[in-house]
Each structure stands twice: as structure tokens, then as C-alpha cells.
From Swiss-Prot:
Keywords annotated in UniProt: Disulfide bond, Ion channel impairing toxin, Neurotoxin, Secreted, Signal, Toxin, Voltage-gated sodium channel impairing toxin
Name of the protein described by the UniProt record: Toxin TdNa6
GO molecular-function terms, A-Z: sodium channel inhibitor activity; toxin activity
Species this protein is from: Tityus discrepans
Disulfide bond positions: 32-82, 36-58, 44-63, 48-65
Family: Belongs to the long (4 C-C) scorpion toxin superfamily. Sodium channel inhibitor family. Beta subfamily.
GO cellular component: extracellular region
Annotated localization: Secreted
InterPro entries: LCN-type_CS_alpha_beta_dom (IPR044062), Scorpion_toxin-like_sf (IPR036574), Scorpion_toxinL (IPR018218), Scorpion_toxinL/defensin (IPR002061)
Domain remark text: Has the structural arrangement of an alpha-helix connected to antiparallel beta-sheets by disulfide bonds (CS-alpha/beta).
Expression (tissue specificity): Expressed by the venom gland.
Purpose of the protein: Beta toxins bind voltage-independently at site-4 of sodium channels (Nav) and shift the voltage of activation toward more negative potentials thereby affecting sodium channel activation and promoting spontaneous and repetitive firing. Is toxic to arthropods.
Length: 82
């Protein structure tokens, strides 16, 4: 039983370490979230990949990205300038 708990804990830790960061794409020109009001999921996916993320989609009205590298800049509520 202890072995099973240890295995599950290790798998969860691996997911956290390997999964990368996720969040809203930062529009560096104004410090806000990158809007996809007139865009699409494929447009957001391309934008996210251009900013070193693995993939992204339009979480209307802003682009949401998965798999950012550790040095990637993303939008944060605490540093929100909008």
C-alpha cells in the first residue's frame, strides 16, 4: 500500500515538473492579456507557440497557453496593468 501511494505521488510530481507553466498570453505593448475577440483558437495556438508555449486556444476573449518555458513572460493578476 505504501508503495502504491509513493508511485502515485511520484507520478503527480512528474506531471508538475514536466507539464510547464500555463496562463494567459501577455501583450507586451500594454501589459494586458492578448485578446482573441476577433481571433480564433488556431490564431491563439500560433501566437502561443511563437512565445515558446506548447499550445494554446481562445478562452474568449483572451488567448490561454499551455507549456510555457520557465523564462516565458505571461500575464499575472498581481502585475495587471489594465
Amino acid at each position: 500500500m505504501k508503495g502504491m501511494i509513493m508511485l502515485i505521488s511520484c507520478l503527480m510530481l512528474i506531471e508538475v515538473v514536466v507539464g510547464g507553466k500555463e496562463g494567459y498570453l501577455l501583450d507586451r505593448s500594454n501589459g494586458c492579456k492578448r485578446s482573441c475577440f476577433f481571433g480564433s483558437t488556431s490564431w491563439c495556438n500560433t501566437e502561443c507557440k511563437s512565445k515558446s508555449a506548447d499550445k494554446g486556444y481562445c478562452a474568449w476573449p483572451s488567448c490561454y497557453c499551455y507549456g510555457f518555458t520557465d523564462d516565458s513572460k505571461m500575464w499575472h493578476l498581481k502585475t495587471n496593468k489594465c
